[in-house]
């Protein structure tokens, strides 16, 4: 009989094939990408922080994950000795095992605590918590109460972090209600895994929910490029088409109901057709007042706040780029990049940024963004943080305009955009030689991650990193200028 971990059980609930591949076809699994590794690292950091809220515990973390016996024995011993707190208490029973984040004795009660990096309890959290309770109970150590411990996104950092950064929610009732269901599925999955034959499972919404699948590339290999699953905001349409054996966007029948943007996708692929509504585009951009300030923020959004007066997962600006276009065509560039050290030494990089705004922005002319809601919200948050600068910051907000609706609204479409209206989808269609490929930092996620890592690692003097971040952000606003000038030329 195969022994299932908590994560394997969750995989099996998501898809029979996923858990079967975990045991029999690991060769199909793709290497862990940077984004997934970042999620793992975040979970580890939050787990360590949660332990600090229950200090001086015994640590049962296995030294060798292929041999859990020492951890199981230590957990039993410390529980019998009524140790107040145990980290990674390990249990095994009924062909399953689990390692509990925190086992805490609160008076006469024993609490099981599972730690999550989310800001609420998700439905799928009950799956792994219920499995953990099942294993603990059948190992002879049923906790009195089961808690989910997750990030409180209303917590505001002021100096040292406190326990209020976490929320504890009692989910004992839900976990108990799931015990029969856990046993049935554990038995079903165990029996299925005894058969060395790949189970039958069609692709479906479960391939990406509640988690992306490491084997999707294998199960979806029959799906062609430019498939119906690439329809923008497709919802159920792709599955309706798939069930009719219609796989490619260009094969979608004319009488099948599509949105304007989806029609542009189909016509673009079928006829290599570009679309431009000059009147609508002119109506958007011809009203903008010079000089035009093409503006873009870069932000970090750490689960564990690094700057006072910020909340978990709050978008905190650390950089901006600004290209200023005069009516006569003159173009100048301004920029700001905070020192990572200022996020931990008591300095206020956000105040420095606001002061730089005052030097870089004139008192007239529209501020051009790409997705204005993001920049506007950051400016409003800065106004809230610095009341003395609120009038100035709100005056900037009133001048903000947006390039995104031209493409998101389907007023300008190129087949190369596919289902996206992002800068990185639009730019290659307009200026194929102007790319991000020669940059060390090629997207906002990487910029955010690298800057945050420099704060965490105390890497405050890396001039190469600083140069790469500046080049990336400058490229974003210059791309906006190129897109704007292209549109002006087309509507003239």
Regions found by a protein language model. Give the residues of each.
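Metal-dependent nuclease catalytic cores that hydrolyze phosphodiester bonds in DNA/RNA
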Residues: 1-108, 233, 237-274
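A residue-level signal for conserved active-site and pocket-lining positions in enzyme catalytic cores
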Residues: 15, 102, 132, 213, ...
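Short acidic-glycine loop/turn motifs at beta-strand connectors
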Residues: 105-109, 145, 222, 325-329
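Flexible loop/turn segments at secondary-structure boundaries
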Residues: 28, 120-121, 155-156, 259, ...
């Amino acid at each position: 009989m195969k022994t299932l971990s908590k994560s394997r059980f969750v995989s099996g609930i998501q898809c029979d094939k996923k858990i079967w591949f975990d045991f029999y076809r690991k060769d199909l699994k793709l290497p862990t990408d940077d984004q997934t590794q970042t999620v793992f690292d975040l979970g580890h950091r939050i787990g360590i922080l949660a332990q600090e809220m229950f200090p001086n515990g015994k640590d049962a973390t296995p030294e060798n994950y292929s041999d859990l016996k020492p951890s199981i024995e230590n957990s039993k011993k410390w529980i019998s000795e009524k140790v107040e707190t145990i980290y990674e208490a390990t249990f095994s029973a009924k062909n399953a095992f689990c390692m509990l984040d925190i086992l805490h004795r609160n008076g006469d009660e024993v609490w099981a605590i599972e730690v999550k990096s989310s800001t609420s309890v998700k439905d799928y959290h009950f799956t792994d918590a219920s499995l953990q309770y099942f294993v603990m109970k059948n190992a002879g150590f049923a906790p009195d109460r089961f808690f989910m411990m997750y990030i409180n996104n209303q917590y505001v950092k002021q100096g040292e972090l406190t326990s209020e950064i976490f929320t504890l929610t009692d989910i004992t009732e839900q976990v108990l209600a799931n015990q029969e269901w856990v046993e049935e599925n554990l038995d079903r999955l165990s029996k299925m895994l005894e058969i060395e034959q790949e189970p039958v499972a069609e692709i479906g919404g479960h391939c990406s929910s509640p988690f992306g699948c490491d084997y999707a590339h294998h199960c979806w290999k029959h799906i062609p490029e430019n498939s119906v699953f690439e329809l923008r905001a497709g919802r159920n349409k792709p599955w309706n088409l798939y069930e009719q054996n219609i796989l490619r966007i260009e094969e979608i029948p004319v009488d099948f109901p599509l949105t304007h943007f989806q029609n542009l996708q189909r016509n673009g692929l079928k006829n290599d057709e570009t679309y431009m509504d000059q009147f609508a585009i002119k109506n958007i951009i011809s009203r903008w007042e010079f000089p035009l300030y093409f503006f873009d923020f870069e932000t970090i959004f750490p689960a564990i706040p690094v700057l006072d007066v910020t909340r978990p997962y709050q978008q905190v600006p650390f950089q901006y780029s600004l290209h200023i276009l005069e009516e006569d065509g003159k173009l100048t560039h301004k920029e700001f990049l905070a020192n990572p050290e200022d996020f931990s030494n008591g300095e206020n990089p956000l105040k420095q940024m606001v002061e730089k705004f005052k030097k870089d922005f004139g008192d007239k002319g529209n501020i051009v963004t790409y997705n204005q809601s993001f920049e506007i919200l950051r400016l409003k948050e800065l106004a809230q943080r610095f009341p003395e600068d609120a009038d100035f910051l709100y005056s900037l907000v009133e001048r903000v305009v947006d390039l995104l609706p031209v493409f998101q609204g389907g007023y300008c479409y190129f087949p190369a955009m596919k289902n996206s209206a992002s800068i990185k989808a639009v730019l290659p269609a307009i200026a194929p030689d102007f790319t991000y490929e020669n940059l060390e930092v090629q997207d906002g996620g990487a910029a955010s991650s690298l800057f945050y890592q420099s704060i965490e690692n105390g890497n405050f003097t890396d001039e190469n990193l600083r140069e790469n971040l500046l080049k990336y952000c400058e490229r974003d606003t210059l791309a906006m200028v190129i897109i704007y000038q292209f549109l002006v030329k087309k509507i003239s």
